[in-house]
Amino acid sequence: MGKRFDEQVDILLDEAEDKRMCFTAYNDASRKDLKRRLKEGSVASPLPGLYTRPAYWERLDERDQALHKIRGLQQIHQLWIFCGATAALAQGLSVSRNLYEPYTIADEHGTRSLLGGVISTRHTTGDRPVFVDGVSCTPLLRTLFDCARWLSLREATVVLDSTLRQGLVTKEEMVADFESRKAGYRGVKKAIAAARFADGRAQNGGESVARAAMWELGFRAPDLQTEVCEPLDGKKYYLDFSWRLPDGTLIAGELDGAQKYTDPQMAGDGGIIDAMRRERIRESRLTACCDAVVRFSMKTVGNAYEFNRLLSSFGVPKDHRPTIKIPSLPAYLRESMPATVPFELERVPLDAYGI
């Protein structure tokens, strides 16, 4: 290949980066040149037929990498219409990481697996596609409907909550659209239930997953972003989750996001140590505002036995039958624990935080 041709490919790689997509070969000559570069290590190929510069690729997070691949696939397969979680991702909605792949496309012939499992097809017809940043996908309400009926409640809640949070549709519009699709679709009741459960006050995907997990365990749906005033100086705080009991008791639930300690951008100018200090102060203030504060991590949320045990121990109320089977205490733990030892909670006094 000549120097001039190499320069042309470099320009096209630059343009692909500007468009936030993977580069695709446009003729046999460019295909050969890219294969040569791949052997040399000057380009990487995240999927067959898609290319990018390694240094550029490594700077992208998982979500951006997925979007780059989706846009690249669209260039190769221009008739494809993306649907489900892939369409949600392309439309800027929050999507659980485990749903980034396989990429889902609409197919009137039903469910199939293509390209070694990288592509999954789903039977989706009847809605005219829309184009979002170069990606052909199902329109927003159809995307939400498919996510709500195909995904688990936890996964669907992440998508639906983020849609409401961004103000793209109202809850009433979403429920009405889902109810209008009762004829000819599977999973309509499941989708409608998910739409009614959705709440745009959830601040992030982690809070959405945690709330759905609470519901699956039979707990009453919490109120979100309840405002409380700290008694010392009247500062306002907003609770991730809260439950007000008939006797007036206020139970607060706080999701401990590890990212605020590990991501320098979220930690702020003071760094991770300062972020931890601020979180400690917040925790102590909430202890003064609320009758009980239960903190939990996403790891706890993912353990149905531990999460159920934790919330129950704090008196979080239940108002319906669990929708999942709650595991019992593992046998090896039952054998090692005396039957008379209760589950104890550590109560930390305010002065322990130096206030």
Predicted regions: what they are:
Residues 1-12, 25-29, 164-355:
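Surface segments flanking catalytic/ligand-binding clefts of nucleic-acid enzymes
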Residues 1-187, 316-355:
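Short gly/ser-rich loop at a beta-strand->alpha-helix junction or flexible surface loop bordering the NTP-binding
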